[in-house]
Structure formats: C-alpha cells, structure tokens
C-alpha cells in the first residue's frame, strides 16, 4: 500500500518503511510526525481526497535533522570583480512507520 502525502509545499509518494528527505520540520530526532494524505492506492482502486482523505493516516519518525550538500553561486563581471556565495538547504529525514487506510 502506498500514499501520496503533502508537506512543505511538495507531494511525496511513500510506503511503509521508506526514508524520505523533506523540507525542514520542527521536532527532535526520534519524534513522531503525521502527514496530510492526498491519495491512497495499492489495493484495488486508488482513493483520492478532495483535497485530503479523512480517516487515513501516515505516521513517521524523525531520523535526522541535517543540511543538503552546499550549492555554490559564483558571479564574475568583466570589470574584474567576483562574488562567491554558498547555500545549504536544511532538511528532515523521516522514516515512514505506518500507512493506515
């Protein structure tokens, strides 16, 4: 059974046991999180919510709070100046523990 969840302005297709890197969530490592479920499928026909499904839950456990690999932004002008900036986007890694329909 799989589900499509919404978090951080994005949608993810998850199943029980999946590890997903999502936009940063408030919470400590080992904490529990619940997600809005948009679609459930895998057994017969898929159920689609309008916009979410009532009575369907997807629970996860926070495994890590970290940052992605650094992205470098480099600008150079012909006048001779350069500008180098970096950015590391924070994320939360979640282990999907249950998908209940």
From Swiss-Prot:
Gene Ontology molecular function: any one: rRNA binding
Matches recorded under InterPro entries: bL21-like, bL21-like_sf, Ribosomal_bL21
Classification via Pfam families: Ribosomal_L21p
GO cellular component: cytoplasm; ribonucleoprotein complex; ribosome
One example of a Gene Ontology biological process annotation: translation
Highest rank taxon of the organism: Bacteria
Keywords assigned: Ribonucleoprotein, Ribosomal protein, RNA-binding, rRNA-binding
TM segment ranges: none
Known role: This protein binds to 23S rRNA in the presence of protein L20.
Family: Belongs to the bacterial ribosomal protein bL21 family.
Quaternary structure annotation from Swiss-Prot or TrEMBL: Part of the 50S ribosomal subunit. Contacts protein L20.
Protein name as annotated: Large ribosomal subunit protein bL21
Organism: Anaeromyxobacter sp. (strain K)
Lineage: Bacteria, Pseudomonadati, Myxococcota, Myxococcia, Myxococcales
Gene it is expressed from: rplU
């Amino acid at each position: 059974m799989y589900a499509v969840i919404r978090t951080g302005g994005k949608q993810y297709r998850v199943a029980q046991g999946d590890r997903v890197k999502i936009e940063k969530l408030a919470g400590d490592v080992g904490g529990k999180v619940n997600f809005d479920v948009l679609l459930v499928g895998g057994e017969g026909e898929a159920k689609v919510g309008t916009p979410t499904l009532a009575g369907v839950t997807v629970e996860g456990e926070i495994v890590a709070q970290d940052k992605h690999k650094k992205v470098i932004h480099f600008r150079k002008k012909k006048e001779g100046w350069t500008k180098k900036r970096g950015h590391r986007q924070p994320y939360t890694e979640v282990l999907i523990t249950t998908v209940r329909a």
